[in-house]
């Protein structure tokens, strides 16, 4: 489950119309959400609040061997007036990433008044307030204290600047300066393609990521153009560090159906619709990815599909051409939808929908109905298993005013010293290997926000 601050950052991206799917770093985001989710460690409590439309705070207390915690603050020039902040009102699908429908690429919005300094230099607010900006800082306690800071800024309709700082305080008796690193990322998204330029002070690492979308350019699209049914994207990334002589690169492909492929097309104005026009192009959304890392010889393919609004599956197969090692992972998620109270008027609604003219558009109603179904879900169950029978089970749901996340990890490769000691004492053995224990760990995370 995402933290409250991550949820606010996603709301900032949506509020500034930034398409996070049009990035090479999000090429396998759907498969990672279904296969690489993490389970909570021990007990952790999150208390968060959106005290003003522009300011949020969050406090975390956890017990992972030792008691630890963190304090977070966030400020944004974009007000979150319409963003649900109470834990009882936040849609669970916003906090629990699962199968995500890829957003179609769109042309950047040009009406930001970014050139107001040249047009009317006398009536101009400070540039800090004219462009969407977000500041976020988290202090992790107890010592060694770690400070994480984040700076986000939309410098233009197509440019996005990110500065991330991580500083760790040394031991109490150490006189050395705190270890710190800075990561700078400049993103450029035109809808047709996107580029990301990265630099990290850690080993002076330089990086580049790019993504290209096949098909028409959204900047030259017209209002009468038919919606796209699918999207094919190709991307690559490269890294180089002159200090450590580190070189890395990868490339990948992604094919995904778009929302228009699973929607039932609207009927013609004359009311005569053929059989092909009354059925969707695809019965369910799906996403295919292929990634290749030439230097290490790693090849990975994923296939994710949403069989129903409340059920999704995903699988991944990896192979290394140098070591001949392979990996196979499968996972699924099952959403539980809360039952709506029956007011006895459903028969009237069905009769009214049946009597509507065929020429009325159906897409807005379908999108509204789909959104209502997603907001009505109150729990999700995720299961993941690999070829070594390592199993992770995660349940996330709403309990009264709280958002609860509980998970357990099972696997044959872990060993328990206590179980080995008990077995050795009972059998009289003084040496030997440990008894395998399938119990890897269990944890519960509780989130409350106001």
From Swiss-Prot:
Signal peptide: none
Protein name listed in UniProt: Mitochondrial distribution and morphology protein 10
Gene: mdmB
GO biological process: establishment of mitochondrion localization; mitochondrial genome maintenance; mitochondrial outer membrane translocase complex assembly; mitochondrion-endoplasmic reticulum membrane tethering; phospholipid transport; protein insertion into mitochondrial outer membrane
Pfam families according to UniProt: MDM10
UniProt keyword Transmembrane, yes or no: yes
This protein's domain notes: Lacks alpha-helical transmembrane segments, suggesting that it resides in the membrane via beta-sheet conformations similar to those predicted for other outer membrane proteins and porin.
Similarity comment text for this entry: Belongs to the MDM10 family.
Biological source species: Aspergillus flavus (strain ATCC 200026 / FGSC A1120 / IAM 13836 / NRRL 3357 / JCM 12722 / SRRC 167)
């Amino acid at each position: 489950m995402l933290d409250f601050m991550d949820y606010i950052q996603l709301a900032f991206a949506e509020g500034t119309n930034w398409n996070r799917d049009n990035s090479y770093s999000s090429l396998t985001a759907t498969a990672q959400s279904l296969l690489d989710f993490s389970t909570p460690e021990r007990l952790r409590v999150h208390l968060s609040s959106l005290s003003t439309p522009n300011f949020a705070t969050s406090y975390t207390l956890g017990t992972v061997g030792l008691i630890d915690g963190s304090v977070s603050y966030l400020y944004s020039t974009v007000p979150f007036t319409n963003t649900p902040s109470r834990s009882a009102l936040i849609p669970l699908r916003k906090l629990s990433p699962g199968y995500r429908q890829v957003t179609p690429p769109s042309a950047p919005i040009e009406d930001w008044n970014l050139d107001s300094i040249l047009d009317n230099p006398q009536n101009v607010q400070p540039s800090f307030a004219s462009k969407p900006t977000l500041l976020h800082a988290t202090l992790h306690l107890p010592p060694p204290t770690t400070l994480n800071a984040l700076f986000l800024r939309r410098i233009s309709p197509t440019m996005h600047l990110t500065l991330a700082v991580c500083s760790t305080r040394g031991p109490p008796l150490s006189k050395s300066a705190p270890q710190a690193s800075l990561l700078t990322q400049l993103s450029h998204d035109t809808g047709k393609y996107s580029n990301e330029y990265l630099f990290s002070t850690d080993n002076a690492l330089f990086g580049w990521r790019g993504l290209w979308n096949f098909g028409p350019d959204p900047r030259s699209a017209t209002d009468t153009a038919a919606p796209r049914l699918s999207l094919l994207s190709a991307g690559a990334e490269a890294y180089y560090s002159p200090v450590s002589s580190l070189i890395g690169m990868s490339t990948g492909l992604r094919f995904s159906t778009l929302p228009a492929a699973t929607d039932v097309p609207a009927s013609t104005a004359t009311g005569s619709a053929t059989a092909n026009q009354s059925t969707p192009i695809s019965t369910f959304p799906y996403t295919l990815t292929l990634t290749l890392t030439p230097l290490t010889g790693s090849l990975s393919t994923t296939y994710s599909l949403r069989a129903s609004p409340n059920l999704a599956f995903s699988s991944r197969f990896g192979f290394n051409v140098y070591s001949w090692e392979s990996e196979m992972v499968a996972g699924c998620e099952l959403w539980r939808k809360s039952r709506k109270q029956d007011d006895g008027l459903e028969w009237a609604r069905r009769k009214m929908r049946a009597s509507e003219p065929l020429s009325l558009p159906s897409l807005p109603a379908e999108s509204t109905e789909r959104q209502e179904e997603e907001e009505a879900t109150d729990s999700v169950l995720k299961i993941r298993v690999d070829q070594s029978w390592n199993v992770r089970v995660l349940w996330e749901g709403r309990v009264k005013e709280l958002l609860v996340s509980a998970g357990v990890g099972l696997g044959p490769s872990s060993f328990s010293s206590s179980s080995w000691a008990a077995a050795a004492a009972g059998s009289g053995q003084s040496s030997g290997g440990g008894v395998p224990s399938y119990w890897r760990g269990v944890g519960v995370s509780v989130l409350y926000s106001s």
